Design a protein with these regions (language model features):
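Active-site helix of classical SDR
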Residues: 117, 154
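Residue(s) in the substrate-gating loop at a strand-loop-helix junction
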Residues: 138
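The beta1-alpha1 cofactor-binding region of Rossmann-like NAD(H)/NADP(H)-dependent oxidoreductases
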Residues: 57-67, 99
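SDR active-site lid
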Residues: 171-243
Length: 278
């Protein structure tokens, strides 16, 4: 999308963190933004601060996401940009988790994206000049690590859903585009998101402090929500499928694909009658 002035955007998880940063950047180029969030007090504060409308929405419930879409269409008449950004990020070892832990995170991180697509895509397809869906995954949607089982499962899912959606939209000749946002370390409150969970005390998932996790060589290369917002804005303009926020941290992703390639090569060597994909 080239001309963004007066376009209509919906940002879930938009009352704080990356969602707020995305909303601010969209506003800066003339986009009319509606934020949705599960936290009513945060919605009220951010809506007042930015001078925009906020609608309390639990993305894990399709009825609420559908109601959000209908309200936006009723009040604004169109939706051009959808940022499925709401997410949670506590951690826990798989052996310590409950099934409720898995359901809680998948309901928000993965089903929240699916709900957004199903509720809004028909409206985006009505636009003469198309639209854009940006789904927030994570670099943990391409690599995995101990303690991140449900989180990685949900974010891998978001990557796959977005890839398939982009392929299908292209196949049908649609002017709607899809991108997946792959953020690295960002200064948000996602690591303390279990505050929104009623049964958090009994859960195997616990809030984390990224400063205590040895994932990087040297200081953690934090980005701010507004920096992430600029990357999203650039992605809407370019139509790029994969929106990396920390490309300098991509080596583990490449290493993973090399391990996959190695396993494939070993399988070919063990079964010489198969032809090499080269």
């Amino acid at each position: 999308m080239e001309k963004l002035d007066r376009k209509i955007a919906v940002v879930t998880g938009g009352a704080s963190g990356m969602g707020k940063g995305i909303a601010e950047k969209l506003l800066s180029v003339g986009v009319q933004v509606i934020i949705a969030d599960v936290d009513p007090s945060a919605i009220e504060a951010t809506s007042a601060e930015l001078g925009i409308e906020g609608i309390t929405t639990d993305v894990s419930r399709f009825d609420q996401v559908q109601a959000l879409a209908e309200k936006v269409m009723e009040r604004y008449g169109a939706v051009d940009i959808l940022c499925n950004n709401a997410g949670v990020g506590p951690v826990g070892m798989i052996a310590d988790l409950t099934l409720e832990d898995w359901r809680w995170m998948l309901d928000i991180n993965l089903w929240g994206v699916i709900h957004g697509i199903h509720a809004f895509l028909p409206y985006l397809k009505r636009n003469a000049d198309g639209g854009h869906i940006i789904n927030t995954a994570s670099q943990a949607g391409l690599i995995s690590g101990p303690g991140f089982g449900p989180y990685c499962a949900s974010k891998y899912g978001v990557v796959a859903v977005t890839e398939v959606l982009a392929q299908e939209l292209e196949l049908e000749g649609s002017l709607v585009r899809a991108s997946v946002l792959l953020p690295g370390p960002t200064k948000t409150a996602i690591a303390t998101s279990s505050r929104h969970r009623k049964d958090a005390v009994a859960a195997g998932l616990k809030d984390m402090d990224l400063n205590d996790i040895d994932l990087f060589d040297g200081p953690i290369p934090w980005k701010t929500p507004t920096e992430i917002g600029q990357i999203v804005l650039d992605g809407v303009a370019s139509g790029e499928l994969y929106l990396f926020t920390h490309p300098e941290l991509s080596r583990p992703i490449f290493d993973r694909f090399e391990r996959i390639r190695g396993a494939s090569d070993r399988a070919l060597n063990a079964n010489p009658h198969h032809e090499s994909p080269d």
